Amino acid sequence: TDGIQYCFDYAESVGKPCVVNISLGSHLGPHDGTSASDQAFAAMAGPGRIIVGAAGNEGGTALHVGKDLEEGDTSLKTMIGFSESSASKLAYVDIWGSKGAPLKVKAVVVDALKGKVMYESPAVETDGETDVKYTFPDGSGVVSTVQMALQKNPTNERTEVMLMCRAKSIAENRKIGIVATSDAGTSIHMWNNAAEGYFLNGGKRGWTEGDTDYTVGELGGVSDNVISVGSYNTKMEYTTLGGVVYGINTALVGNKGALSLFSS
């Protein structure tokens, strides 16, 4: 924010308007305009001061998962997926409950064949423990440490849990999962901020699949006064300075005249 304010101040000193473009993608935050950065952007923008944010390039990654809770079904259960090409299996998951609602979160080891919880960590919860560091036991099929921290955001009155997972190895028939519980009539949302992370249900009943909803980045336009910019396919080939013509892979970007598949 200091850099943006510097640009605005200089523009004002020379009597000119100013537009600042930012591309600092992150999915840590509530994605509702109430984060500290979003509030700061909203306050700085105004006549002659425009902020433009990149929506992000995660439109093809299921880094979000959410659920509306009902009577008799007050938990969101999901599994963490890791890219096979990823050298280190890391997950940075930001979990948010509804305004004024309690929240309880625990990490689990799941039998990938049956969808059954085999091992679980102690929980962090609104009226209980707020910090947990847990190592899954020997024989669980998972060599991993999980850390969780819970806090209530004073601005939006929503409870947040930040979960960090670092796995050295995961057996083929095991998955690391998250179980989040709150009140009926409320919602839970999660975002995986790791570059190679996503959510899945493993094809098992009772578990929730990840999706690409709510994937416009925290710094890309969820603030009230920020203009969001995504990617749109205007051409399907380009010519290099050497005269070589290259085509665009439609499997990666989509068809001409459409929103790019990767655009959040």
Language model feature labels by segment:
Residues 1-264:
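Loop-rich non-cytosolic ectodomains and luminal regions
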